């Protein structure tokens, strides 16, 4: 591995890993469940890097031995040929391990392990845009289920002809943000709407925002900036009308963000849920500002995560979903059923390659 700075980083990671392993055996840590969990999680995050580094060191040792045999076996052509073949195989394996180590050493997004609020807003296209937003709610719900994540609809504004003008899903599980952050942006659909009598193809859009969940410590909200009103949940009449005002309408004066929560059973729960969504929205706004600064330095092909960036077109006539960042087409039916893991993995790989190229340029 030519890059000495990478070796220095790997040695540092190895030392940290062994120190965390030692701490797990410390009786003081072992008897403190919270600290034990924190140390165990930190150690687990380094384990693949350390294991890969160990494998790489073993390969270097075997490679040096094979090269020596190849040099010294001039009088034995058969042995020399075997040694040269082993050198070639080990060199290829070493290059593969080095590439993997570079990826493992890339700085991690601090939000990658967080749960998220996924917001879908109908864009241009009227009633058809709301129906399309409903299709996206189903798509992400199916994908979340395939990942064994928990999904809950926490806020909704129904469309007049079906679907949603706006919907917010809470998605919880392992590394939710690390995958779904690549879905942020404008999703465009081209199809003949069910509401269209003449059979003309319409283009509609919906915007997806991915908001990592944050706690009160990470985002401070001044109570004076909040306007809170209550309303009755339920339908227009009959038994579904809630006689108690459990719904909460929250307005954040500095940003103009309005959140209407009706999904929880009590007013207090709806207020807590509205505040949780507000914190996530404010945090996402802060992330957008940071991301725009990064983008000005590195024009990412995989996308900026901006709400205004068109990332995918879903064409019903041609039965294809085109991801504009990857420049690739995918089978529409599979994508609509939530089969987007392949797209997301391709985005992750492309993002990593861009970061590696940037790192190489910076250290050249």
Swiss-Prot record:
<dbReference type="InterPro" id="IPR050057">
    <property type="entry name" value="Prokaryotic/Mito_RF"/>
</dbReference>
<keyword id="KW-0648">Protein biosynthesis</keyword>
<feature type="modified residue" description="N5-methylglutamine">
    <location>
        <position position="239"/>
    </location>
</feature>
<feature type="region of interest" description="Disordered">
    <location>
        <begin position="291"/>
        <end position="311"/>
    </location>
</feature>
<dbReference type="InterPro" id="IPR004373">
    <property type="entry name" value="RF-1"/>
</dbReference>
<comment type="function">
    <text>Peptide chain release factor 1 directs the termination of translation in response to the peptide chain termination codons UAG and UAA.</text>
</comment>
<dbReference type="InterPro" id="IPR000352">
    <property type="entry name" value="Pep_chain_release_fac_I"/>
</dbReference>
<dbReference type="InterPro" id="IPR005139">
    <property type="entry name" value="PCRF"/>
</dbReference>
<comment type="similarity">
    <text>Belongs to the prokaryotic/mitochondrial release factor family.</text>
</comment>
<protein>
    <recommendedName>
        <fullName>Peptide chain release factor 1</fullName>
    </recommendedName>
</protein>
<keyword id="KW-0488">Methylation</keyword>
<keyword id="KW-0963">Cytoplasm</keyword>
<dbReference type="Pfam" id="PF03462">
    <property type="entry name" value="PCRF"/>
</dbReference>
<dbReference type="InterPro" id="IPR045853">
    <property type="entry name" value="Pep_chain_release_fac_I_sf"/>
</dbReference>
<dbReference type="Pfam" id="PF00472">
    <property type="entry name" value="RF-1"/>
</dbReference>
<dbReference type="GO" id="GO:0005737">
    <property type="term" value="C:cytoplasm"/>
</dbReference>
<dbReference type="GO" id="GO:0016149">
    <property type="term" value="F:translation release factor activity, codon specific"/>
</dbReference>
């Amino acid at each position: 591995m030519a890059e000495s700075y990478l070796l220095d980083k790997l040695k540092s990671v190895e030392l940290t890993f062994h120190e965390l392993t030692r701490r797990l055996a410390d009786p003081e840590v072992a008897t403190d469940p919270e600290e034990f969990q924190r140390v165990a999680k930190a150690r687990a995050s380094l384990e693949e890097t350390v294991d890969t580094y160990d494998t790489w060191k073993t390969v270097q040792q075997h490679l040096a031995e094979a090269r020596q045999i190849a040099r010294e076996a001039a009088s034995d052509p058969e042995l020399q040929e075997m040694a040269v073949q082993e050198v070639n195989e080990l060199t290829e394996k070493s290059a593969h391990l080095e590439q993997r180590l570079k990826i493992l050493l890339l700085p991690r997004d601090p939000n990658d392990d967080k749960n998220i609020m996924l917001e879908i807003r109908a864009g241009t296209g009227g009633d058809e845009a709301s129906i399309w937003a409903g299709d996206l709610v189903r798509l992400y719900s199916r994908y979340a289920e395939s990942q064994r994540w928990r999904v809950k609809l926490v806020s909704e504004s129904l469309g007049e002809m079906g679907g949603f003008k706006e919907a917010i899903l809470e998605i919880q599980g392992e590394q939710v943000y690390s995958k779904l952050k690549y879905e942020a942006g404008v999703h465009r659909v081209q199809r003949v709407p069910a509401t269209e009598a003449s059979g003309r193809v319409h283009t509609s859009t919906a915007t997806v925002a991915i908001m990592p969940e944050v706690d009160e410590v990470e985002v401070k909200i001044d109570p004076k900036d909040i306007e809170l009103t209550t309303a009755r949940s339920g339908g227009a009449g009959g038994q579904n009308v809630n006689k108690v005002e459990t719904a909460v309408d929250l307005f954040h004066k500095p940003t103009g963000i309005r959140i209407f929560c009706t999904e929880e059973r009590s007013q207090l729960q709806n207020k807590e849920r509205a505040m949780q969504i507000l914190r996530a929205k404010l945090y996402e706004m802060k992330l957008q500002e940071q991301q725009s600064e990064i983008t000005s330095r590195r024009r990412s092909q995989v996308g900026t995560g901006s709400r205004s960036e068109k990332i995918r077109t879903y064409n019903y006539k041609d039965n294809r979903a085109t991801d504009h960042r990857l420049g690739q087409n995918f089978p529409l039916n599979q994508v609509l059923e939530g089969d987007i893991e392949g797209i997301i993995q391709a985005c992750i790989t492309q993002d990593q390659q861009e970061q590696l190229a940037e790192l190489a340029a910076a250290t050249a």
